[in-house]
Structure formats: structure tokens, C-alpha cells
Amino acid sequence: MHLRTLHFLILIGIFIGGQTLGCMKKVCGNNAKNDFRRCPDTDGSCGNYHTERTSGEIIDGVDVRCHLGEPIYAPIEGEMYFWRPYGGKREKSCADQGVRIEGTGQWQGYAVHISSVKLSFFGGHVEAGDEIGEALNRYCFNDRGQNDVEPHVEIRLYKEGRLIDPTHHLQNCMCTGQICESNTRNVLLGDPFKTDKRYNGVRGWDVECQMIDDDDEDSPRAPMIYSPIAGEIVGRIRLFTDSNGAYTGCDNDGIFIVGIDDWLGFEARLYNVKARADIGFGRKRIIQGEPIATRLACENSPDSVFVEIRFEGRVVNITDIITAANCKTPNFPVF
């Protein structure tokens, strides 16, 4: 089998089992949607971000519903460490166990704290979705009625050392995911949501997309491009015509995808890319994150792809969703 074909098949496998940039895997047992405990709960407390807990303290974290003994999974990839959420207090020792995961790869710069958890092992690298332990009773040290509160584990998410709201990284997560194979975090070139004269002045994001040097290849190869949205129609974009009205030029290529499901009403346009020959154009089912194209490798091709997003036909700014800063579903008016 040709090495580049083999590489593509590996990419397909990664895509099938992969994780969307900015979206966490499930944390507990059968709680596939990472549902939070009731708000208000039986004692009036709440498990949402920046709300009052049973102790009366305002917590910048969330309580994911989870019964005693249910398996706990790593929501992100990273390096795992044992952590004591109650700082070694003897009277709370039965619940003073947790985990800290320092993010790597797509989650570089993030850290997740989960408590209370009895760990199956106490360190090392974990992939998102790996089983790491089981849930403990967070109120085992207190017999004053908290047993009526929905059982849960507490999640705190840090970015560059600062607590942030993990809600839309855990629930209803709607980030685009990684767009270019050689850019795991959708690093942008220049300002976000900018106008680019190279593509007839369209407005969007210039996503870095370097050629890839494989050890088993003599020359760099063009990186794969992943669909930022789920779609059902794929079409071709040709920006320029010659004096005879013909579309010519190696770098005169791009694609558009018409959204479905959570992306209904959206359209993604990608410039400086060439659709995979085996996909072609027309009506077909495209899964978000599916490898659908390669970056162009023409003589003057930039080391980037340009992404334009429209909603109901109008160009919209979804910078936070592209960069995974916030994966909340945008609330655009329907025109």
C-alpha cells in the first residue's frame, strides 16, 4: 500500500474516534451529555457555574451528575496527577481525593480538576475518554442532610492558570474543531475575522496550515483539511476567470459546505483547498471533522487556508467557535 494512502487511512481512523477541538468527552458513567445536578437542588444549592453550593460558597466550577462508584473518564488529553481537593483536612479525608489533568495537544494551556474521585492509577499520560477511576461520595464527611443532594463530581477548568466557565465545553458544544491537519489548535495568522484581498475581499479567518514533512517521504506533502461543520452539499469555489471566461490556475480553487443538523442555516467556505477526488461534489453526507480536502500546494500557495462562515446567507463572526475560546451555540437572528 502506498505510504500516503496508508497515512490517509490512519487519518480517517483518527477522525472516527477523535474529539472536536474545544469539546470535552463525557466525564461520568452513563451521563453522556454531562448533565449537571439540579438547580435548585433539594437544599437550594446549585451545580451550575458561579453559583452557590451547599456550603454557601460561590464556586467557579460545575457539578456533573454522577453516582457513587460510577466510572470517571478523562474529559481531555494530558498529564494526570493526584490532587487533594480539601487540602489534606483530616475531617474530610474520605472525600479528599481528586485528579488534575494538565492538557496537552489541543488542550495545551488548559487544566481540569475533578473531585471527588478514587483513581485507578496516580499519574501518566491520558487520552480523552480514558477511564481513570470511580466517583466518591463528596458528602461522606457530613451527615446534615446533604445526602439528598444529587450525587455528582465537581469540575473546574483553568485556561493559562485562570478559572473559566466549562459549561459549553461540556454540554451542547458547538466549536468547529481542528481545520488543518498541521494546526491542532486553529492558530490564526493576523487578526481574526479580517478581510482578505486574495479571495475577492471575503471576511473570515486565515488559519495557519503548514506543509507536512513525513519521515517516510522525500518531499513535504499537503495537509488534510477537515470539515468545520456537518453538511449535506459540497460545492466548488472558483474565484477568477481568464479573458475567455475560463477558470484557470493552480491556486484558483476552494470548496463550500452547506450545513445540516446543529449547523442548519450555516455555510462554510474554504479557500486555498482542493476537494478530495473520491468525495467529489453534489449532495452527500459530510460529518463534522471529516477529511474533505487538502491544502493547495501551488508555487505561490500561502501556508494557510482561509475560512468564511455564513448564516442565512450573511457573513457572521464566530471567532470564539473557530478558536474554541467558547463553544456556546451562537444566537444569530434568522433573516
From Swiss-Prot:
GO molecular-function term, one example from the UniProt record: metal ion binding
Listed GO biological process terms: innervation; regulation of dendrite extension; regulation of dendrite morphogenesis
Keywords annotated in UniProt: Basement membrane, Cell junction, Cell projection, Disulfide bond, Extracellular matrix, Glycoprotein, Metal-binding, Neurogenesis, Secreted, Signal, Zinc
Location relative to the cell: Secreted; Cell junction; Secreted, Extracellular space, Extracellular matrix, Basement membrane; Cell projection, Dendrite
Residues annotated for Zn(2+) binding in this entry: 63
Reported tissue expression: Expressed in body wall muscle cells, along the boundary of the lateral hypodermis, seam cells, processes of the nervous system including commissures, sensory dendrites in the head, and lateral nerve tracts, and motor neurons and some mechanosensory neurons such as ALM.
Signal peptide: 1-20
Glycosites: 317
InterPro entries: Dup_hybrid_motif (IPR011055), LECT2 (IPR008663), Peptidase_M23 (IPR016047)
GO CC aspect terms: anchoring junction; basement membrane; cell surface; extracellular region; perikaryon; sensory dendrite
SUBUNIT field: Component of a multi-protein dma-1 receptor-ligand complex, which is activated upon binding of lect-2, mnr-1 and sax-7 ligands to promote the morphogenesis of dendrites which extend from the PVD neuronal body. Within the complex interacts with sax-7; the interaction is required for lect-2 dendritic localization and enhances the binding of the mnr-1 and sax-7 ligands to the dma-1 receptor-ligand complex.
Primary role: Muscle-derived dendritic guidance cue, which is required for the formation of somatosensory dendritic arbors which extend from PVD and FLP sensory neurons during development. Ligand of a multi-protein dma-1 receptor-ligand complex, which is activated upon binding of lect-2, mnr-1 and sax-7 ligands to control the growth of dendrites that extend anteriorly from the PVD neuronal cell body. Enhances the binding of the mnr-1 and sax-7 ligands to the dma-1 receptor-ligand complex.
Family membership: Belongs to the LECT2/MIM-1 family.
Protein name: Leukocyte cell-derived chemotaxin-2 homolog
Lineage: Eukaryota, Metazoa, Ecdysozoa, Nematoda, Chromadorea
